[in-house]
Amino acid sequence: MMDPQIERKLIEIMRVIHESDKPIGARAIADELNNRGYDIGERAVRYHLRILDERGFTRKHGYAGRTLTDLGENEMNDALIGDRFGFVISRIEEMAFRTTYNPETDKGDVVVNISYFDKDDFETVIELISYTAHAGYMISPRVRIFEEDSLEMSLPPGKIGIATVCSVTFDGLLLKAGIPVEPAYGGILQIENKKPARFLDLISYSGTSIDPIKIFMNRTPTSVLEVLEKGEGKILANMRQINSSAYEMTGKILKKAEKVGLAGCITLGEIDEYLLGAPVETGKFGAAVVGGINGICALEETGIEIETNPISTMLDYQTMKEI
């Protein structure tokens, strides 16, 4: 039986390959693993890749790098399921740490979601995402478009990619100010009279191996279009917990973010009190943050087919344009 530590590294390498939009090489894999706290060099990665090749889990594409086979995808999904319960939170913490955006200079990297859709739907996609963002139900009205021939992203034929700002950017802004943020829940938030009323459903980040927001997306229970048209309905939102000592500082940072249009609809609760029906631990307060993909949910409600990868990657905010 192979050393559990080697098996652990094999799974992490497979995750990196899985999350890449195109074939990825050993050097890039090593760099990404180092970002995630794994001290492993390019040579060691090549050794592990040979094992994955022999098992039929990876496919080599010349000098471009490797992708996962169907067998590899299944193995990654099945392996070490117990360990993956903390993976979503670790992913959020990692991306928050990599956030470098500064509202005062309007420069730096933000966390983004990547979605793919048919070229023919381009005008509708832009119009509805813009409408949703400017109404305050997304994190930012800035997006970045990736054409089919983009060198930065591998897209299926006939598809266009769009990057939208992820709510984890909020975690990053606070972390850079020395304020740790705890991902508590993802959920469905009821909107009444254009204001947050209560959470209708919640999934704890600590109790799932899948991003709760993605779970709710797949259930398609939102009514973002009704929120936009009537001011009432259901949207996606996250709930964060923050230590009570950071209450005033959190408010100040949010105001700075709002001035540059990077906040969306964020509701801060009171210390030691439930927020919109969601429980809060003693000595902390809650922050309800709108999901960065509510515009995508609105598009799905119209019948447009669109595939989304939440918490996908980092982008320079200045390369994103307001729509």
From Swiss-Prot:
Gene Ontology terms, MF aspect: DNA binding
Record text on subunit structure and interactions: Forms a complex with NrpRII and the general archaeal transcription factors TBP and TFB. Interacts directly with NrpRII.
Region annotation (NRD) ranges: 86-323
Regulation (activators, inhibitors): Under nitrogen limitation, binding of 2-oxoglutarate to the NrpRI/NrpRII complex decreases the binding affinity of NrpRI to DNA as well as the binding affinity of NrpRII to TBP and TFB, which leads to removal of the complex from the operator, RNA polymerase recruitment and initiation of transcription.
PANTHER family to which the protein is assigned, alphabetical: GLOBAL NITROGEN REGULATOR NRPR
Residues in the signal sequence: none
Role summary: Plays a major role in nitrogen regulation. Under nitrogen sufficiency, binds to the nifH and the glnk1 promoters, leading to repression of the transcription of the genes.
Keywords: DNA-binding, Repressor, Transcription, Transcription regulation
Domain of life of the source: Archaea
SUPFAM superfamilies given in the database record: Winged helix' DNA-binding domain
Disruption phenotype: Disruption results in significantly increased transcript levels of genes involved in nitrogen fixation or nitrogen assimilation though growing under nitrogen sufficiency. It also leads to a significant reduction of the lag-phase after a shift from nitrogen sufficiency to nitrogen limitation.
Disulfide partners: none
Protein's UniProt name: Global nitrogen regulator NrpRI
